Amino acid sequence: MTDEPQSDEQQTTEQERPLGTKRATRADGLRRPGVRSGLAERRSPAADSVRNGAAAVRRFLLRDVFALGLMIAALVIVILFFTLLGATKPTSSGTGIPLSQVFTLARDRAIVEATLLDEDARVQVHTRDGAEYWAAYPSSGAQTATLSSALERGGAIVAVKQQPGKAQVTIVVQFLLPILLLVCLFALFMRIGQDGGAGGIASFSNFTGRGRKKGKGTAHRVTFADIAGVPEAVAELAEIRDYLDDPSRYLDLGAAAPKGVLLVGPPGTGKTLLAKAVAGEADAAFFSLSGSDFVESLVGVGAARVRDLFAKARRMSPAIIFIDEFDAAGRKRGAGIGQGNDEREQTLNQLLVEMDGFSGDGGLVVMGATNRPDILDPALLRPGRFDRQITVDTPDVHGRSEILRLHGSKRPMAPDADLDEIARLTPGFSGAELANVVNEAALLTVRGGRREISQKLLEESIDRVVAGPAKKHLLTERERWIISIHESSHAVVTEAMGTGATARKVSIVARGRSLGTAAHMLTDRDQTIMEEPDLVMQLIAMLAGAAGERIEFGHLSTGVHDDLHEATSLARSMVTSFGMSDELGPVTIGEKSGEVFLGASLQDLGAVGPKTLDLIDDAVERLVKDAELVARAILRINIDAVHETAHALLEHETLSGVALEAVLSTVTTVEPEHFPELRERERGSARDRDA
């Protein structure tokens, strides 16, 4: 390998370099001469801020001729000020002495000639020995006459120098030029502030978000081709794009395009990405900002920014205004407990007026994105403002497969990588989480020095996204056996119920706060509606770990905490939300309150009496205990499979694929209709053991 730097065609960036390859280095371990070190590229943040600010001001001045003229005028005033400043200084030559000494020299007849400077209020004297002095005297007429008389009595020749024009120059330098300079600077700062880009006095009340003029953006824009898994949302937004491109198709039929489109969905489902795609495809101006940008510490700033934003958008019509995290600006009015001012309400009121004012906005579309539509003000959601609400939910198994293919197409995938199986392994994942799975797999590929992303690394990345990286801390043999029994019980019970959800991986490797995992693979179709038997089987599977520990050791460990918490929460939902209890019947208890200040997330149990609360607790306890009894009965039938799986886990730590199928092949299947019989049998056995 030579020490010569590579040519431009040979050099590649980190993004272009294939996965698993390393940056080229010299044989002695040093970088090539053409590569700068990280230390050489470090710059001061303060210097960068000053440099960026200066560049912004320079671009603004070149764009605004009036501001450039103000800047030139200010420079001329400064130059003129320093030029005339010397002319206003008092004229003085010789040595300065007190005025009393001048009177003494005059009495001694030592002064030959004296000159009175009228504007400077100074006297210059020449003595008989050739010395030259000056002294300041009061500029009143009486003092001047007294000094002149004393000099004449001393035999000096007295002259008065008028200094014409010096008073006017002094006024110009001391008063006029500073005022003109302040006026120019004030006008310049106001001009910069109104532009909104370089900062300034008016920038508080101006729209400061991101925007671009009419056009389809740069070559790196986001389009609908970059979106997968949400075909319904894409179809709805494509209609908005078509209207902005050719409104005549809709106007000929008397159809009016929606004034506002609200994207609603959980975090990470692609709401912001959809807005970027509309901006990338529509031939319209695009303005983007966050709902929190409207709220400032200064009262009235939010409303002013709303007015400025809509004014700019109307001037550049057709235009799209996108407000991310819309709930920050559109929260319900009138319920702000402890609210110190009505700044948020002023902002919302101005937004309501702008979206449905007296003037028609034919080419203006407002898009908002939020994951909390329940706290938005109802006035925003009525037709005429946000006419259309588009729900962007987590993708189903087919949508997940499309999203994984979209991200996988940008990376080298190994032949064994099955993205359809990864889609089945990730129920409930959002688009952002799926992108993170593929990215984690790519990072693991680079870490292992490989060139392609394999199926094993994709499955490992799922575990990393769900539970975190694996921990390498040491456990005692007793602790490892407890965890093995716990996770094996989950896998065996899930396999025995035969619901179509089979265990795909069991591990005793600790991740995050979990000491082990028993992941399950769903069928090729996500279940949309859950029936009561489905939820009961979920309860049984959740409590299988606790049941296995109770059978094997006669007591529970702290490792069942998360399982008990999830099972209790599910049982309470079955009783209070789904009406699946004999004690209360088909009723819903604990509607969510509408307190906006509290986030509308607390249950309102004020109208529920203590007797009903006791019934709820009894029903929840019955569901949980019955589910554990069934889990114990299933485990007693398949206790040999539990032990075989646990011993395999102690040896290999993780079981999946063929190895897991082998240890679970002896599991006896139990049909749901036999659950009541198993429950009563286990309850009777428990009574016999207690007796």
From Swiss-Prot:
Membrane topology note: Multi-pass membrane protein
InterPro entries noted in UniProt: AAA+_ATPase, AAA_lid_3, ATPase_AAA_core, ATPase_AAA_CS, FtsH, P-loop_NTPase, Peptidase_M41, Peptidase_M41-like
Alphabetical keyword list: ATP-binding, Cell membrane, Hydrolase, Membrane, Metal-binding, Metalloprotease, Nucleotide-binding, Protease, Transmembrane, Transmembrane helix, Zinc
Binding residues for Zn(2+): H486, H490, D563
Cofactors (names): Zn(2+)
E.C. number: 3.4.24.-
Molecular function terms from GO: ATP binding; ATP hydrolysis activity; ATP-dependent peptidase activity; metalloendopeptidase activity; zinc ion binding
Annotated segments matching region Disordered: 1-48
Keyword hit for Zinc: yes
Transmembrane segments: 65-85, 169-189
Main location class: membrane
Pfam families: AAA, AAA_lid_3, Peptidase_M41
Binding site for ATP: G265, P266, P267, G268, T269, G270, K271, T272
Extracellular side: 86-168
CDD domains registered for this protein in UniProt: RecA-like_FtsH
SMART domains for the chain: AAA
Disulphide bonds in the chain: none
Active site annotation, chain numbering: E487
Cofactor, free-text remark: Binds 1 zinc ion per subunit.
Similarity field: In the central section; belongs to the AAA ATPase family. In the C-terminal section; belongs to the peptidase M41 family.
Alphabetical list of NCBIfam families matching this protein: FtsH_fam (TIGR01241)
Its biological purpose: Acts as a processive, ATP-dependent zinc metallopeptidase for both cytoplasmic and membrane proteins. Plays a role in the quality control of integral membrane proteins.
Protein name: ATP-dependent zinc metalloprotease FtsH 2
Lineage of producing organism: Bacteria, Bacillati, Actinomycetota, Thermoleophilia, Solirubrobacterales
